[in-house]
A protein has these predicted regions:
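N-terminal carbohydrate-binding accessory modules
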Residues: 1-53, 452-453
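Hydrophobic faces of well-ordered beta-strands that scaffold small-molecule active sites
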Residues: 26-32, 61-63, 98-102, 180-184, ...
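The substrate-binding groove and active-site-proximal loops of carbohydrate-active enzymes
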Residues: 27-40, 64-80, 140-161, 260-278, ...
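Aromatic-lined substrate-binding rim segments of carbohydrate-active enzymes
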Residues: 43-132, 167-171, 280-291, 541
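Polysaccharide-binding and catalytic clefts of secreted carbohydrate-active enzymes
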Residues: 112-329, 334-337, 347
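Hydrophobic targeting/anchoring helices
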Residues: 293, 298-502, 590-616, 628-632, ...
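A short, well-structured beta->alpha microelement
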Residues: 319-320, 507-527
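A conserved amphipathic helix/loop scaffold
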Residues: 390, 537-729
């Protein structure tokens, strides 16, 4: 009988390091999905794919189990299915280490008995479901499902009790000896999004509203304090309700809420996200308390990019709260699905702010669920690829998190995508092909060879984001009839934020600059000395202390400071261009642009970027020599000024072109590693270039030699950054 696995995440040599039995281990994994026909480890197709990955060095595997599957109607625990799930993996790979994703959903019968403990929706009634056949139990999560509320004390107690019993019981079995991590899962697709958040406005159920009232009373010092803060004399807590959809979709200035008049909406989103984070921490803590030996506690969390304009409705604004908790070791996320990130030639970057995660000492795991040519894509029948393209994408997607100090799992929907050759084959996994398996083995060996080495990433560009800013921005439900799975929807009330998040990230990744990212809440502790260019992106709300820190610590040492869109337009008490002007040094106004199209032009670069509707946008008054961009009607949209200690820039719309960022970087004295518009990654001693066009390149990694090379078209090439040696071509 094998000795029980012990696992932890520890800060070693500049990175959060996964330790399995005390040994640094590259966190690259293979994962089964929850899809019927592909979810049970002992069945022939999943077992084959587990064995294939094991043959190529993989020892870390992931699979799902639901509390509902291990409890009988009276709540008695039966671990048979969970043990069999782990045993199937161990049968295919005897020295496997297993991460179990434990879904904390209460059974439908529980929800029917406790309707007041379930989520509610401001715009629609919850929709009871009737299960039929082998359904994915999470398939209706983004409708308006009947689900226990995150804020229900009764559900929290139910989940903690049964999760604790599950962990203690499984850990005592022979199969439990192979488990190195428990990933707690709930919310849409287990990813801790509010149920129904795409097209509905959660959570307005009785449990959530009762918790909101308690939270408000604590925040504002009782009922009278709430009435004062909301400027509603005589308001009682009993009268407090969650905001309706109209209130959530309303803005005061452009996309910004009034922090006084709309305080009730801002308060509600603050409550939703603090309570959500506290629930994740609580469940991870239950695992920690119940598992009798060191185990990695994991959770989907920290989603920032690719949130479809629904950041406040269903994102993770309180990520700093989770990062500060010792109960959570590992944050995970599905990939960015935007057209600029997902396909060949895209960036393949993570949904989270990985710099902040790494500095907090948490391990980050990406999900790699990009389809391959082996069996196609179950949600996109028009998908096409080739094995060489599959190799290029696999390399890019697995090395993206590796170069940022994290890891990934390959999430295999291929088994439910159909058979590529009906007369010869049945269901087949996405990576069940010799060249793809060999490539995974090479990537794993590359990552494992670095697992115990010092980590470094020579970034000289820093992008600062504040997830909490989205509590101050209007957001709108998507229209169900317009939704197509796999197609990115756009917001009806906020056309700018996607340019500040996805647009900035994608263009920076393809600029040849090396950037890191940070949370605004990290401002007091950050070391700014490595950075020549600091970008304030989603920072609409900056209080007096933050403005002082920016003026004193960021705008110093000749650094260039870039303000994007509505940065600093609110101080938490007032909102508008005059608030921004008072601290930025730029004469600023709200410009009601009938055609909100910006043309940037400087240092040989030109970029045209526009909104799809008339909108109120920032405009500036400054000497013509300091104007680098104009709106369609000629009003200045992008300006700069030189101060004694720093150079300041302001953009009405953020640059979304790699060339614009390169020009800014050169102005600031940043190193440009690659002059071409293609995904260029640097970190952990690796330089990675992902290209569609290919051709001759001159690459300049910091601290390394100038590399002159001819890249193949549609390829991902990996270099040793310090020597220029080609590691994978």
């Amino acid at each position: 009988m094998r000795s029980p696995v012990t696992a932890s995440v520890a800060n070693r040599s500049g990175r959060p390091t996964l330790l399995i039995d005390g040994r640094p281990t590259a966190p690259l994994m293979y994962a089964l999905t929850d899809s019927p026909g592909a979810r049970w480890s002992w069945e022939e197709v999943p077992a084959r794919n587990i064995a294939l990955f094991a043959e190529h060095g993989c020892r870390l595997f992931q699979a799902d189990i639901w509390l509902e599957q291990v409890l009988d109607p009276e709540g008695a625990l039966d671990l048979t299915l969970a043990r069999r799930q782990v045993a199937g993996i161990v049968a295919a790979c005897p020295d496997a280490c297993v991460m179990l994703r434990v879904h904390l959903n209460a059974p439908p019968e529980w929800c029917a008995r406790h309707p007041d403990e379930c989520a509610g929706y401001a715009d629609a009634p919850a929709e009871p479901e009737t299960r039929r056949g082998l359904e994915r139990w999470l398939g209706r999560d983004n409708d308006a499902p009947v689900r226990a509320s995150f804020y229900s004390e009764r559900w929290r107690a139910w989940a903690r009790e049964h999760l604790g019993r599950f962990c203690a019981g499984l850990a005592a079995t022979p199969e439990g000896a192979a488990v190195f991590s428990i990933q707690v899962a709930y919310g849409v697709y287990g990813e801790w999004h509010q149920f129904g958040f795409f097209c509905h406005d959660p959570d307005t159920g009785p449990a959530a509203e009762a918790a909101f009232r308690r939270w408000l009373a604590a925040l504002h010092g009782g009922e009278a304090g709430v009435a004062r803060a909301w400027r509603r004399p005589g308001l009682t807590l009993a009268e407090v309700r969650a905001p309706d959809s109209a209130a959530r979709e309303s803005a005061h200035v452009a996309l910004l809420r009034d922090p006084v008049a709309q305080r009730s909406v801002i308060d509600y989103f603050t409550f939703l996200h603090e309570g959500l984070a506290d629930t994740v921490i609580m469940m991870a803590g239950t695992v920690r308390e119940s598992w009798p030996r060191p185990v990695v506690t994991a959770s989907f969390f920290g989603y920032f990019y690719c949130l479809f304009g629904r950041e406040a409705a269903g994102g993770h604004l309180a990520v700093a709260r989770v990062l500060a908790s010792p109960q959570v070791d590992c944050l995970c996320a599905s990939p960015v699905y935007t057209p600029g990130a997902l396909p060949l030639g895209g960036t393949g970057h993570a949904k989270g702010l990985l710099g902040a995660v790494r500095r907090a000492g948490k391990l980050w795991l990406d999900e790699m669920d990009r389809a391959t040519s082996v069996s196609g894509c179950p949600w996109d029948r028009n998908f096409s690829s080739t094995i060489p393209d599959d190799v290029a994408v696999l390399r890019r997607n697995l090395l993206q998190p590796v170069t940022r100090g994290g890891g990934a799992w390959c999430y295999d929907f291929g088994m439910v995508a159909g058979t590529p050759v009906f007369t010869r084959l049945g269901a087949i996994g996405w990576w069940d092909e010799p060249r793809l398996q060999a490539e995974f083995g090479r990537l794993l060996a590359l990552a494992q060879g670095r697992a115990g080495r010092p980590y470094a990433r020579a970034a000289d560009v820093l992008v600062i984001h504040d997830p909490w800013s989205f509590a101050h921005l209007a957001g709108a439900r998507h229209i169900p009839e317009h939704m197509v799975f796999g197609v990115m929807p756009t917001s009806r009330v906020d056309p700018v934020s996607r340019l500040l998040t996805d647009g900035v990230a994608e263009s920076l990744h393809q600029s040849g600059l090396i950037h890191d990212d940070a949370l605004l809440s990290e401002l007091p502790e950050l070391d700014f000395s490595p950075f020549r260019l600091v970008v304030l992106a989603t920072t609409a709300v900056l209080d007096a202390a933050q403005r002082r820190l920016i003026a004193d610590r960021v705008a110093a040492a000749g650094r260039h400071v870039v303000l994007l869109a509505y940065a600093g337009w609110s101080d938490g008490m007032a909102v508008g261009p005059e608030v921004a002007e008072a601290w930025s040094g730029f004469a600023t106004r709200l410009h009601p642009a009938e055609k909100a199209e910006q043309t940037l032009q400087f240092d040989g670069e030109k970029e045209v970027l526009g909104l799809d509707r008339p909108f109120g946008v920032p405009a500036f008054a400054t000497p013509a020599a300091q104007v680098v961009g104009r709106w369609e009607d000629g009003s200045p949209s992008a300006v700069w000024r030189e101060a004694p200690e720093a150079v300041w820039w302001a953009f009405g719309l953020p640059p979304n072109s790699p060339g614009t960022w390169r020009a800014l970087g050169r102005r600031a004295g940043c190193r440009v590693v690659n002059d071409h518009d293609e995904t260029t990654l640097l970190g952990d001693g690796l330089l990675v270039v992902h290209t569609v066009a290919g051709g001759e390149r001159t690459l300049r990694p910091p601290g390394g030699p100038v590399i002159r090379v001819t890249l193949a078209a549609r390829s991902t090439t990996v270099f040793e950054a310090a020597t220029g040696a080609v590691l994978l071509s």
